[in-house]
A protein has these predicted regions:
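Acidic/polar-rich alpha-helix caps and helix-coil junctions
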Residues: 1-20, 30-195
């Protein structure tokens, strides 16, 4: 289950030894009044971890976004499409399409529910994309955002290359595109190799 891998409180090796954490640089983009800050612990000193065995693997910026039903029950709701994603997608589409007023209206309506002190004023598209990155953290969308926008992957200062293979990857770089299997390119002459 997703919660057996991603929650902070279910007792599984994937959680105790493979702790999930937000990029510290992304965390720092949130204002002090952003309610989503509670989804992570920047100190890594959880006093309320369900078992003492969890404490050995506790790290700064550890996930608190996903909570399983219990230490021995990995059940949890998995949202395949969230309303917040629709708000952020609409705001981005209007902003990129030149309708800044509509984009700001939609984004502000969404953002004040996360950050009551939100007042805007920055680059609107950047604000939308930052909020999208925070809101949809670990929900499987970041890779596709980077690919569609042609942006580089930068993991940040709190990642260990031992566990993630690389810390940075340039857009379009080899190993950053899903390769079409060789058997497909060998047998389908209309399919071009991308490896």
């Amino acid at each position: 289950s997703f919660y057996a891998y991603m929650s902070w409180n279910f007792s599984s090796t994937a959680i105790r030894q493979g702790v999930k954490a937000i990029n510290a640089d992304t965390y720092d983009l949130m204002s002090e009044t952003d309610l989503r800050r509670a989804w992570w612990d920047p100190t890594g000193s959880y006093d309320d971890l369900p078992l003492t065995s969890f404490q050995a693997g506790s790290i700064p910026y550890q996930n608190r976004k996903f909570t399983a039903r219990a230490v021995s029950n990995a059940v949890g709701d998995v949202a395949f499409l969230r309303l917040s994603e629709m708000y952020l997608t609409a705001a981005e589409a209007y902003a990129r399409g030149g309708n800044t007023a509509k984009a700001q209206e939609i984004f502000t309506k969404f953002q004040v529910t996360r950050d009551p002190a939100y007042a805007g004023g920055g680059d609107l598209i950047e604000e939308i994309m930052t909020s999208r990155r925070i809101e949809l953290w670990a929900e499987g969308l970041r890779y596709f955002d980077l690919k569609r926008l042609g942006e580089d992957l930068v993991r940040g200062r709190n990642f260990d290359v031992t566990f993630c293979t690389f810390l940075e990857k340039k857009a379009g770089e080899k190993g950053w595109t899903w390769e079409i299997p060789k058997i497909e390119t060998d047998n389908n002459k209309l399919c071009e190799k991308n490896y």
